[in-house]
Regions:
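Helical element adjacent to the flavin cofactor pocket in flavoenzyme catalytic cores
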Residues: 58-101, 106-111, 258-262, 266
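C-terminal catalytic lobe of FAD-dependent flavoproteins
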Residues: 69, 77, 122, 130-174, ...
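Dinucleotide-binding Rossmann-like beta1-alpha1 core, especially the glycine-rich loop
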Residues: 1-45, 164
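Flavin (primarily FAD) binding-site architecture
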Residues: 114-129
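A broad structural signal for alpha-helix termini and local helix breaks/kinks
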Residues: 25, 46-49, 127, 206, ...
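Helix-loop-beta segment of a Rossmann-like dinucleotide-binding subdomain
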Residues: 3, 23-25, 43-81, 107, ...
């Protein structure tokens, strides 16, 4: 649900138009279309939702995933298909002739695919291979709160244009996310500042505020922002492919486009 309050940065007509287009451009779907819910209905669903200034909200459908479990499943599928996995093996260097150098040995392959994610350009740099792209890395942190979540929400951060999510998660409440620039070599973990930022945003919309003592756990992930050498001012969260000899580099990407990206990489292998 996306609640609309008096003074919200996104007005009802704008959100409604966007969700109408979202529903109709998506084509056939097993999911119900977006609908407007009154303030009374929202408060019946969640009595702890902030009532002051609440006009109502739009209910819409979306998906939820466990990225860690999905990644492990993909690895298992690769193993079942005959792939040999080397876990906890640091790649020291690669080259454009098919060599992969790890700590204690080297391998020669017909093709090498660099899917280092946020570290793809770092691997090229330490291998002495020029990159046509630059990656900046952005950390997104999350809180898992010791409270059941009766309703999933998409909410505005107070005094900002940013949005954040409050979602049911394994019997608890998941709150996220932040957007903080960081270096690829830095620890990927939720900072105290991010913790306080998310708690304050969450507490703005509840009549039963929580404190740091109510946090079950925190976690963070790192997203690559892709910059082209041709236009270093423009960033994107999409992906790009680059081929140099026997080496195929994948820059950027995200889970929602992973399958389409995999098909394009497969075409490069033919």
């Amino acid at each position: 649900v996306l609640p609309i309050y008096q003074g919200s940065q996104r007005q009802r007509w704008l959100v409604g138009t966007g969700l109408f287009l979202y529903d109709h451009l998506a084509g056939k779907s097993i999911l119900p279309p977006a609908q407007w819910l009154t303030a009374e209905t929202l408060l019946q669903r969640d009595p702890q939702l902030k009532a002051e200034g609440l006009l109502g909200g739009y209910a819409f459908s979306d998906g939820q995933m466990d990225d860690r479990r999905l990644a492990l499943w993909v690895a298992d599928q690769a193993r079942l298909a005959g792939a040999k996995l080397h876990e906890h093996s640091d790649v020291i260097a690669i080259d454009t002739h098919g060599h992969v150098h790890i700590a204690d040995s080297s391998y020669l392959h017909d093709r090498v695919i660099n899917v280092g994610g946020p570290w793809a350009v770092t691997l090229l740099k330490q291998s002495g291979i020029p990159s046509p792209y630059r990656l900046d890395t952005v950390r997104g942190s999350h809180l898992v709160l010791e409270r059941e979540c009766p309703q999933a929400y998409l909410l505005e951060v107070p005094e900002e244009r940013r949005i954040f999510f409050v979602l049911p998660w394994q019997g608890k409440t998941l709150v996220g996310t932040t957007e903080v620039r960081q270096q690829a070599h830095e620890p990927i973990e939720c900072s105290v500042a991010e913790r306080d930022y998310l708690l304050a945003a969450y507490n703005h919309y509840t009549t039963a505020p929580l404190s740091a003592a109510n946090i079950n756990s925190t976690f963070a992930g790192m997203r690559p922002l892709l910059y082209s050498a041709a236009d270093p001012r423009k960033a994107t969260r999409e992906y790009a492919l680059d081929r140099q000899g026997q080496l195929i580099n994948v820059f950027g990407g995200k889970w929602t486009t992973a399958l389409a990206l995999a098909h394009k990489v497969q075409q490069q292998l033919l």
